[in-house]
Regions:
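A short coil-to-beta-strand element that immediately follows conserved catalytic motifs
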Residues: 16-22, 161-164
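Charged/polar, solvent-exposed surface patches and flexible loops
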Residues: 7, 11, 32, 66, ...
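Conserved amphipathic alpha-helix within the SDR
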Residues: 34-42
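Conserved SAM/SAH-binding loop
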Residues: 20-30, 38
């Protein structure tokens, strides 16, 4: 799935999109993957131009979210979109770091209890444990993925995403979005 999505985004938006067909379970690897490259700018006003990296946390456990949170806090500039859902409900949070400052809280800042969770990485679970760990419905997964795509689309096409967080329930067919408060968006 990751390979196909990366290839589609790269083709449609004429940009570089990377994927890794493996679990990332250490901070050094993740930090290396999200490092923004830079190059000399054409204008004196912008002597150095940096890539804008978007980390999409499509993970199914809090230990992986804790790792993404640590990488977010170490990053100079990063957009971190995290989607999480259970069987019928979930949320998508867009965190932003700019020039070493947190402009918008990431998922760990919005839901600090997940930073204390004691679960395991997917590679540490047996097949039986993994299948029982967190029941999810196809509708909740599709809803979370659609919100992530909308956020990324707005960043790539419109240059910003004004949505900080979207909570949803597929059982009650409800969606609620918290917008930026007249500050620069992602």
């Amino acid at each position: 799935k990751a390979k196909i999505l990366a290839e589609r985004y790269a083709a449609v938006f004429g940009m570089e999109a990377e994927y890794l067909p493996a679990f990332v379970e250490d901070l050094d690897t993740l930090t290396t993957l999200i490092h923004a490259d830079g190059w000399a700018g054409e204008y004196s006003r912008y002597p150095t131009v940096r890539e804008q990296v978007i980390l999409i946390g499509a993970v199914d456990n809090d230990k992986s979210r804790q790792l993404c949170h640590k990488a977010f806090l170490k990053a100079e500039n990063l957009i971190y979109i995290d989607s999480g859902n259970g069987e019928f409900s979930g949320q998508v949070v867009c965190g932003v770091r700019r020039n070493g400052r947190t402009i918008r809280k990431p998922v760990g800042g919005v839901f600090p209890e997940l930073l204390k969770a004691q679960d395991r990485f997917p590679s540490e679970l047996s097949c039986a444990e993994a299948s029982l760990a967190d029941p999810q419905s196809m509708a909740a997964n599709i809803t979370a993925a659609t919100i992530v795509v909308d956020m990324v689309y707005n960043i790539l096409v419109n240059g910003e995403c004004s949505a900080r967080q979207t909570d949803f329930s597929t059982k009650t067919v409800r969606m609620s979005t918290t917008l930026d408060k007249n500050r620069s968006a992602a």
